[in-house]
From Swiss-Prot:
Originating gene: rpsK
Official protein name in the record: Small ribosomal subunit protein uS11
Annotated InterPro entries: Ribosomal_uS11, Ribosomal_uS11_bac-type, Ribosomal_uS11_CS, Ribosomal_uS11_sf
Gene3D superfamilies xref list: Ribosomal protein S11
A single GO cellular-component term on record: ribosome
Subunit structure: Part of the 30S ribosomal subunit. Interacts with proteins S7 and S18. Binds to IF-3.
């Protein structure tokens, strides 16, 4: 019986990126933070649900802050220094996610709101009756 050849794997060095973009998608139910390079290639991401918050606790500003810190720390391995922040959506975690990225140690160069605004497009959901 022939022996299987064992191949030693060399660990590939992570590329260094200085400038990046933090995409914050803040919905009413969750907050998702994705950190990319300038071309849009993903470096790190985190969400409030993936950070251990379930149910109604996912949609809190604190959950968005924790998720933002996790994504920010994961992207530090790439040597990221400057971040441009793009916020999308009406959720409660918009501002706290930006503050958390600032607290991690990034230099935030620009904050822009890229929420989709309909020019009288689809009919919105009906009002809630609680």
């Amino acid at each position: 019986m022939a022996k299987a050849a064992t191949r030693s794997r060399t660990k590939r060095a992570k590329r260094t990126v200085v400038d990046g973009i933090a995409h914050i998608n803040a919905t009413f139910n969750n907050t998702i933070i994705t950190i990319t390079d300038r071309q849009g290639n993903g470096l790190a991401w985190a969400s409030a649900g993936g950070s251990g918050f379930r149910g109604s606790r996912k949609s809190t500003p604190f959950a968005a802050q924790v998720a933002s810190e996790r994504a920010g720390r994961a992207a530090l391995d790439y040597g990221l220094k400057n971040l441009e922040v793009r916020v999308k959506g009406p959720g409660p975690g918009r501002e706290s996610a930006v503050r958390a990225l600032n607290a991690v140690g990034y230099r935030i160069t620009n904050i822009s709101d890229v929420s989709p605004i309909p020019h009288n497009g689809c009919r919105p959901p009906k009002k809630r009756r609680v």
